[in-house]
């Protein structure tokens, strides 16, 4: 078992590829269709994360669909209509599933507690590890991100530990500002606008 939510997403995609599924257009509800005459701005929010993408993720420990900006384009958003691509990343990493992901340091249990890291669908505790900077940069490049928000800074600030991986090397910082500076400098070549959020409010 891969540790998915077991809510039936993969069987739905299997039906689609086998051409036996029900298309959304067949059960159209006009009341919920965006009125083209409004010409408003649309913010598309993707679920899950880059490394769960069916093509770019850690296969087979992936979801059944596309978690990249390509998923929006595949579903009818014209590429030229996209003005900004926002990336949202935790300043540490989490994962729910059957593969071994969490490090052996007991501090990860503390991060899980402070960050309330439990699966949104199943309530399972998320495995926690330090930010993989190489993977982050890959996600930025593949998606063409031009605006990047790091959240959960408040969690690391509360436990007073700021670490990340760059390749096989772990970098340990003495304060939050040092970690933020390092990340900002290392991402200069991507020309991405970066915001570090320590907002504790629930969304």
PLM regions: where:
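Non-transmembrane, aqueous-exposed alpha-helical and coiled segments at domain scale
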Residues: 1-203
């Amino acid at each position: 078992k891969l540790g998915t939510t077991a809510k039936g997403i993969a069987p739905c995609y299997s039906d689609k590829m086998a051409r036996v599924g029900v298309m959304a257009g067949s059960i159209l509800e006009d009341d919920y269709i965006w009125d083209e005459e409004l010409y408003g701005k649309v913010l598309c929010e993707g679920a899950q994360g880059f490394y769960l993408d069916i093509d770019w993720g850690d296969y087979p420990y992936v979801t059944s669909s596309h978690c990249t900006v390509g998923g929006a384009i595949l579903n009818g958003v014209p590429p030229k209509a996209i003005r900004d691509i926002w990336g949202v990343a935790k300043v540490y990493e989490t994962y729910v599933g059957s593969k071994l992901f969490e490090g052996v340091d007991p501090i990860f249990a503390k991060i899980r507690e402070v960050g309330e890291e439990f699966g949104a669908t199943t309530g399972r505790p998320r495995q926690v590890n330090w930010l993989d900077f190489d993977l982050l940069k890959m996600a930025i490049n593949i998606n063409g991100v031009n605006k990047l928000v790091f959240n959960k800074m408040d969690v690391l600030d509360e436990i007073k530990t700021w670490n990340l991986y760059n390749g096989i090397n772990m970098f340990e910082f003495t304060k939050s500002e040092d970690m933020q500076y390092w990340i900002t400098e290392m991402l200069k070549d991507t020309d991405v606008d970066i915001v570090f959020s320590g907002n504790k409010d629930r969304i």
